[in-house]
């Protein structure tokens, strides 16, 4: 649970501006439904900005070259992904952000199941 906007909406945890409120699919879909058609790109871009705020220090600390997002492409691709990239570029050194490849995962819903299976295999059988 991470705060990305101190003046943001009240979260179920009692704090304001938590990343979940701007990025979790159910919350993002609700905001898109409530907004007009002209606001949808801005709502998605705002969520992408929040994602970039959360990811930038991690990308810098670990010097990551690749970030792969998994989730509903109709929500994550386009304005959200573009805004996340832009925010990361602003918040990291150019040596880090210039080499960064941030993209959508290919494989859809099965990736979540595969990730869970890998965690089980690793924890229970030592397979990595």
Residue ranges of predicted features:
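Short, intrinsically disordered, charge-biased short linear motifs at domain edges
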Residues: 1-4
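ATP-binding/phosphotransfer module of carbohydrate and carboxylate kinases, centering on a glycine-rich
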Residues: 7-10, 15-128
